[in-house]
Design a protein with these regions (language model features):
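Alpha-helical structural signal
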Residues: 19, 100, 178, 196, ...
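Hydrophobic alpha-helix immediately C-terminal to the catalytic Tyr-X-X-X-Lys motif of short-chain
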Residues: 157, 161, 165, 195-199, ...
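N-terminal Rossmann-like NAD(P)+-binding domain of SDR-like oxidoreductases, especially those catalyzing
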Residues: 1-184, 311, 319, 330-332
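Short aromatic-enriched loop/helix-cap "lid" or pocket-rim segments at secondary-structure transitions
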Residues: 45-48, 127-131, 186-190, 227, ...
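C-terminal substrate-binding subdomain of Rossmann-fold SDR/epimerase-dehydratase oxidoreductases
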Residues: 205-332
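Structural element of the ATP-grasp superfamily
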Residues: 103, 162, 199, 293-294
Length: 332
């Protein structure tokens, strides 16, 4: 690391949901932070010491932002909810592959101390996620490989790139597999939002009594992690000595209908669920096995879904005053 008393950390995707929160967390924990994105944060000003507006699909921009950095948290990605990622395979694979390769190469050239890559539970084989009563997914379950098309495949490819850069160039890499992150200051409309944000928006916009549309039959299951747990977990994993991919999520498995009922309960409204079976709903079940996370970090996410939905719903409801309801998307 540099000789500065405070190490420099770069957060890519700092204009996005997780990146914006991570910048604030790192600043609160004594780091100097450079953020980079193609856009500024949408809902709140950044806490970063520096913020660069750069397109990371160009190597020269990746070299610029990684210069003099001790740590790189690479969160930048072309992503969205189930509707977006199932309809945009080529664009997602193209954009993310360029960013991931160029960020690794630039970090190597600039002698970055450690590089953390944000992967996804979408790397896990579809065949292990065919039942709502899914067995929690272990890190080793990613192989033999059968990831989700597009987004999941490029994430798994980037995980291997991280491994190769560590083996061949001694770039110390860390890989985090996120499981459905939610919270305030995240995208809640436009098609790129995840299920908790979309559900909060729909309920907030609905009349009481009234109804909301849910994609699929509502029986598909997921676990959801609150943003505060997410950024703490990212920081802990970066500081750890563990070099292989790690799940980062809760193991509190709920159905999409149960998620809806939690949001409705927090809202205090009387709302019925109407299911649209023609819409994409993703895999039938997905849950995080946190056995290795607990073993490595002696820690795991602590915030329950209901506790996290309270501030999330409150924030989204405040954003959607006079808004028109849209469709609920399925979970990732």
């Amino acid at each position: 690391m540099s000789k500065s008393l405070k190490p420099w950390a770069l957060v890519t995707g700092a204009g996005g949901f997780i990146g914006h929160h991570l910048v604030s967390y790192l600043k609160a924990n004594g780091y100097r932070v450079r953020g980079v994105d193609i856009k500024l944060p949408e809902y709140s000003s950044t806490d970063a010491d520096e913020f660069l507006l750069l397109d990371l699909r160009e190597l020269k921009n990746c070299q610029t932002c990684t210069a003099r950095m001790d740590l790189v948290y690479h969160l930048a990605a072309d992503m969205g909810g189930i509707g977006y990622i199932t309809a945009s395979h080529a664009g997602i694979a193209h954009n993310n592959s360029l960013m991931n390769l160029y960020m690794l190469e630039a970090s190597r050239r600039n002698d970055v101390g450690r590089f953390l890559f944000s992967s996804s539970a979408c790397v896990y084989p579809h065949g292990l996620q065919t039942s709502p009563d899914v067995t929690p997914l272990r890190e080793e379950d990613a192989f033999p490989a059968q990831p989700e098309e597009g987004y999941g495949l490029e994430k798994l490819y980037a995980e291997k790139l991280c491994q190769y850069y560590m083996e061949d160039y001694s770039l110390y890499t860390r890989v985090v597999r996120f499981h459905n992150v939610y919270g305030p200051l995240g995208t809640y409309d436009g098609g790129r939002e995840k299920a908790p944000a979309a559900m909060c928006r729909k309920v907030a916009c609905a009349q009481s009594p009234g109804g909301i549309e849910v994609w699929g039959d509502g029986k598909q299951t997921r676990s959801f992690m609150y943003i505060d747990d997410c950024v703490e977990g990212i920081h802990r994993i970066m500081r750890s000595d563990y070099r292989n991919p790690l799940n980062l999520g809760t193991d509190e498995l709920v159905s999409v209908d149960e998620l809806a009922e939690i949001v409705i309960g927090v809202s205090g409204k009387k709302i019925a669920l109407m299911h649209d079976l023609t819409k994409p709903q993703g895999v039938r079940g997905r849950n995080s096995d946190n056995t290795r996370l607990r073993s490595v970090l002696h820690w795991e996410p602590q915030i329950t879904l209901r506790k996290g939905i309270v501030p999330t719903y409150s924030w989204i409801a405040a954003q959607t005053v006079n808004a028109t309801p849209g469709a609920i998307v399925a979970a990732e």
